[in-house]
UniProtKB/Swiss-Prot annotation:
NCBIfam families: rplO_bact (TIGR01071). GO terms for cellular component: cytosolic large ribosomal subunit. The gene is rplO. This is Large ribosomal subunit protein uL15. Keywords: Ribonucleoprotein, Ribosomal protein, RNA-binding, rRNA-binding. InterPro entries: Ribosomal_uL15 (IPR030878), Ribosomal_uL15/eL18 (IPR021131), Ribosomal_uL15/eL18_sf (IPR036227), Ribosomal_uL15_bac-type (IPR005749), Ribosomal_uL15_CS (IPR001196). Residues 23-35, 42-52 have a biased composition (Gly residues). Residues 1-59 are annotated as: Disordered. The keyword Isomerase does not apply. Binds to the 23S rRNA. GO terms for biological process: translation. Residues 1-13 have a biased composition (Basic and acidic residues). Part of the 50S ribosomal subunit.
């Protein structure tokens, strides 16, 4: 085998279909757009969700609920994520952000009880679940709501 004998694998390089280049190509004349009509024109076509003038599905369905502008969204942290810290560390939202455990503090940090805590930590957060509170104090750590 020589360099000039190298060829790409069968079917690995598909030839681009050039439309509107003669009838024998199979996509000449109307370029695969059929005859006249909205979809045959340049820039033609209907918008997303258009159903031909019939009331579209999204307008037939009733509206429901609302978004509470006063809702608080907490950054959630589970107990097993706190095991990255050394024994006796004071864990605050700023420390959690620096460690890359939370991206943004949002309305504060809430500690949840999923997983197992193996270290004695002093944790400061906006909220604690009951199971997280129990697990932290059981390991001899302390909690503080800020």
């Amino acid at each position: 085998m020589k360099l000039h004998e190298l060829k790409p694998a069968e079917g690995s390089r598909k030839v681009r279909n050039r439309v509107g280049r003669g009838t024998s190509s199979g996509n000449g004349k109307t370029s695969g757009r059929g005859q006249k009509g909205q979809k045959a024109r340049s820039g033609g076509g209907v918008r997303l969700g258009f159903e031909g003038g019939q009331t579209p599905l999204f307008r037939r369905m009733p509206k429901r609920g609302f978004s509470n502008i006063n809702a608080k969204e907490y950054a959630l942290v589970n107990l097993d994520q706190l095991n990255v810290f050394e024994d006796g560390t004071e864990v605050t939202p700023v420390v959690l952000k620096e460690a890359g455990i939370v991206r943004a503090e949002k309305s504060g940090v809430k500690i949840l009880g999923n997983g197992e805590l193996t270290k004695k930590l002093s944790v400061k957060a906006a909220k604690f679940s009951k199971s997280a509170e129990a697990a932290i104090t059981a390991k001899g750590g302390s909690i503080e709501v800020i």
